[in-house]
Amino acid sequence: MLSSTIIAALLAIGSALGSNGYGNTIDSRFDKLSDLTDKYTLYQVISQPDAVPAEATDNLVPSQPDAEPVEASLSSSESPAQEYSVKERCERYTMKNQGLEREYNLYRPEGLKAGAPLVIVLHGYGGSALKGKKAMMDVADKNGFAVCYPQGIKDPKGKPGWNVRYPSQEGMKTDDVKFLIALSKELQKRFDLSPKNTFLTGMSNGGDIIYLIAMRAPKAFKAMASIAGLQFNWMETEYSYKHPLPFMEVHGTQDHTSEWLGDPENKGGWGAYIPVPAAVSRIIAVNGCTEEYVTELPRREGRNQVTLYQFKAGRPAVKGGRPTEVWLYKVEGGDHSWSDKDMDTCSEIWRFFSQWID
């Protein structure tokens, strides 16, 4: 039970050993969770009775922030432009959805086998599919999967993105959750890609909508990875997490566009949202994870320290499947980016996704 195992471990100084995927043993003492933030532990879940099973929220205490978050910038940035090159390597396609012609770019490594896995990569707000993450194609070359970079629809201010009800998106009728599900089916059928092994990742606005999909359509993708994504308050007013799913989040503690500690008063202008640890805690709870491992990734010279929190032994997402996991990469001092100067982010995403391939 989550309440008896994890909460007790938070109060005790017990430890266990496990593998972190780097060939090392790691200490799984839960007292390290206090390092996540000085205001929120990962298991301090703000009350939402219908969102998670009752046994997953026993004894969890609502957090009370005692300080205002730093005002967020309205600008959204990604990694340097020279790291992005999709146009030269991808094929461009269109499809009809909700009365609109939608664009996407598809990369298939040479010699890709029929029924290969698929990873869909979502750009940030104001971004472009043609400036998608080049490194994911490099990982695809080594591991044999297809990569799709869809293009977001422009909002009334002319900024492309995914509809998560930013103030600038007011009046938009596009349902991007439905579009992304339809896109995955289009790709699977048209290009003979695996319906069982289709994954979703995205950065910033692309990560935001992943939280919404995790609530509305948790079975639509085999696993999901959000980079600098947010769970907005309105999402859990209308929806909740009701089904286990493998989930990963990468987030910098000095991200002043998507604040680690949240923005409950909407000072940043994107809409009110909860702290990142609180958002991830909801997904841990619905997964029913009972084991936790903490490790520091090898630190690159002159770069930020990355700590990986792995939550395991959850409820299987499919009957007879393996227990789910939730991974949180905390980038100490990290900004609003893919954090790929601090770690090999795309390889880490695939390392997580590849565990769930049938």
Where in the sequence are the language-model features?
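Cap/lid segment of the alpha/beta-hydrolase catalytic domain
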Residues: 151-175
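Alpha/beta-hydrolase active-site loop
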Residues: 169-191, 212
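Accessory cap/linker subdomain of secreted extracellular hydrolases
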Residues: 253-293
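Short beta-strand/loop motif that positions the catalytic acidic residue
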Residues: 249-251
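Catalytic active-site module of serine/aspartate enzymes centered on a nucleophile-bearing elbow/loop
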Residues: 344-358
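Short, proline-enriched alpha-helix->beta-strand connector loops that line the catalytic pocket
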Residues: 242-247, 322-326
